[in-house]
Amino acid sequence: MVGLPLCGCAELPKLEHEPLTIMTGCRDYSALEKALKEEYPEVNLEFISYNGYNTTSYFQRLLEVGQIPDIYTTKILPDPALQKEHLIDLSGYDFSAKYAVSRLNECSVDGSIYMLPCNFSVLGIYYNKTLLEKHGWEVPTSFYEMEALIPKIKAAGLEVATTSLEYIGSAFQYLFNLGDTIFLRTPEGLDWADDFLAGKVPADNAWASTLPYVQKWIDLGLINGSWCGKPEKQAAEHFAEGNTVFFVHSGGFRYTQNTDGTGDRYGLMPWLSIDGSNNRYITSTACYFGLSADLELPRNKQKLEDALKFMSFISTEKGQRLLSGDSTQFLPLADSEAFPNEEYRDIMEQLNAGFSAPLAYKGWEELIVPVGEACLNWYAGKSTGKQAIAVMDRALQSSLQNGTASCAVLPEDLTLEEAAQLVGNAFAKAVNADCALISLGGYHDGKENKDGVNGRLFQGPVDDVIISTINPLGWVNTIKTVTLTGQEIRQLAKEGFDLYGDGKPFPYVLTLSEGVKLERERQYTVAICGCTAEIMEKGDLQETSICGMDALRSYLSALP
């Protein structure tokens, strides 16, 4: 019989709470993790690296196949049906009540809230506040007021507007921003968008009231077609010269004439509706956060408690400031003092009153380029609004008919290592290499590896979008090779890719082409993804002309 010591006064070791998993998604959570630990020492986070080229599509794919981490993040709100199936309804928890109603409405799915927003930027039309004050002009709050102001601007020898029109996406965005003030954000407009993207209704009738309005913006010089194709930087610099009242821009901009805070002061106004009753600021949310429905399983009771603490923490101003996004962005919280001056409090009041529209155009991705090109021609006076909408109809039909063709159907899920092996086989075959060394993604003390395979593949059809989620070369980069001996290859495969030179390498997956057996002193051509400067020099790194996407597409298409 073994005697057990009496230890009633001794403290038993505390079991650590099982960590909550969260994918990095090209974000740095180190500051958030540190602050969370100070607030809730018992809560542990485990970071799963994804630093690939298509975060949005990969995270969407994880949701589709039900393989999400405990804490799920995404840049674009997912399909409502997927949210209902895989995420927890957060609407009944106290922390959800801390968010502004307008932000919750953006996330609502039939009255439930499965994802909560983090900080966001606000886009609109910049104006030179100093010029307006100098001439005694009020900031217009409707298009009627804008129409009345423009003759005064011209009479004073000032330019009405500079418009950023370098990019096709900007031209597309301006059309939709003005559409948001007329029809698109109405219940009928939202229904139309769903029906249109499904191919059930045409575009022309829905845009009938918006096109004349956009044309007025063009005619008055607010959308200034003379800037079509000119560099965005040049447009910004021209506005900053101080002789232009408005800057129509698709992104953010500073609020003073000079970068050091001196010179003219700028303000931000919404996209104006005709009578001012439906003005719209455009919001771009940095990220949304939700919790996996698996946390509600009985075995995950402790993890659920910790996950709710995490959500409670990020639902505070302190937590929001530590999330992804610029520190000057707005917060989605109802009682947040996002900025210390009256102007930005006014913006928040308008946002909270519902005078906003999201920037993300989910479902429109295939139409942005053709419609944006048509809009550029329209703004430049080379075509009409009706022609642009006709392009929208044709582009939608082409997208529906052609879709994104699948090049293979996988019979089962692949692990990260198996996905890397597939990439290695594809790259080696494409460039006639003897073998391949493909590094893996990972998370080492906040450091990640973008040069390697970061994602898995799952059972089912594989198209270009899915390929892009695992391709370490992105959409256009080409395959690189080195020449090494068999011994050097084996040694690298054993040691891994020491990207940061800190002795914490990322693993390699070694694949050999058919019939190849590595001999110690013989030299071989190696397709490689992720190598140090030393290996680049030793192996005489060469860049081939073969695109990684083409290689993967060809390899997958040939699979049985």
Indicate residue ranges for each PLM-predicted region.
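Extracytoplasmic/periplasmic solute-binding protein
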Residues: 114, 123, 147-199, 244
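Hinge/lid segment of periplasmic solute-binding proteins
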Residues: 75-124, 138, 147, 173-174, ...
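Conserved N-terminal structural module of periplasmic/extracytoplasmic solute-binding proteins
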Residues: 2-79, 86, 139, 277, ...
